[in-house]
Amino acid sequence: GGSDRTAADLGILFHKKYDTVIDLEKDSSVVSADPKIVKDKLDAVNELSYNEARLAGMFGMKIIDPIAIKEILENGVEIPLIITNMKSPEMITKIQRKPEDRSGHPLKIVTGKKNCAILRIESEMIRDLLTSLDKDKRYSEFIVLSPFTKDGIEFSRILFLDGDYVKRNEKYILSFDPLA
């Protein structure tokens, strides 16, 4: 967690002056599922986009801190991240804005996360909630899902990755749409 963020911050600082690549030495490169749960037939994942790696991290992949990738994205820089398996240095995963190799199966990683919550809110009210979560609460552990229309009203859904956060902040969240 902390070392990933520090490496990302240093990469962001140095990228203008130097050709920067962040190499993170880990116990494993990225594989197709959690090796603590799936024991056999794990596939090596050679490349991921920033977005794929960030979402996989948010949903339980422990190999890289999703906030490190978020910081790179927010600063608008292109810095490749290389995850190197310390036991087998030839096993690497390259993470960058747009992966070079788009061949192969589109399903790369299977993850899972407990204790999530989905909030349904009228789409016209979501902007204020998202702005407040970002600025006031400094909370970003959520994903906005595809909107849908019911009875002529457009709704958005937010997947919160911490159900306890939603419980602790229920009044605050409902203040944006009491019918949510």
What is each of the regions a protein language model found here?
Residues 1-180:
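C-terminal catalytic "cap/lid" subdomain
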